[in-house]
Amino acid sequence: MKTLLLTLVVVTIVCLDLGYTLTCLNCPEMFCGKFQTCRNGEKICFKMLQQRRPFSLRYIRGCAATCPGTKPRDMVECCNTDRCNR
């Protein structure tokens, strides 16, 4: 009986861990308050700053499977904990 109970506890813990989803900020503004639950396979939050023209900046935040690449003059920061891309 104890073995069965222990087995059920272990299976429950493993199943709960598999269902974890990351939460990241997701908006195109500098000051952001909108959160997104990442899809399965997206384990990275990112914050990207793109400079398109002099004095023209674009902010992008969201979820990704891998850290996004950048172009010259762009900056990106990646992290893997909830709401870490502030």
Swiss-Prot record:
PROSITE patterns: SNAKE_TOXIN (PS00272). It holds the Pfam family Toxin_cobra-type. GO terms for cellular component: extracellular region. The keyword Protein biosynthesis does not apply. Its main location: secreted. It comes from the Eukaryota. InterPro entries: Snake_3FTx, Snake_toxin-like_sf, Snake_toxin_con_site, Toxin_cobra-type. Gene3D superfamilies: CD59. Keywords: Acetylcholine receptor inhibiting toxin, Disulfide bond, Ion channel impairing toxin, Neurotoxin, Postsynaptic neurotoxin, Secreted, Signal, Toxin. Disulfide bonds join 24-45, 27-32, 38-63, 67-78, 79-84. Residues 1-21 form the signal peptide. Expressed by the venom gland. It is found in: Secreted. One of its GO terms (molecular function) is acetylcholine receptor inhibitor activity. Binds with low affinity to muscular (alpha-1-beta-1-delta-epsilon/CHRNA1-CHRNB1-CHRND-CHRNE) and very low affinity to neuronal (alpha-7/CHRNA7) nicotinic acetylcholine receptor (nAChR). Belongs to the three-finger toxin family. Ancestral subfamily. Orphan group II sub-subfamily. This is Weak neurotoxin 9. The lineage of its organism: Eukaryota, Metazoa, Chordata, Craniata, Vertebrata.
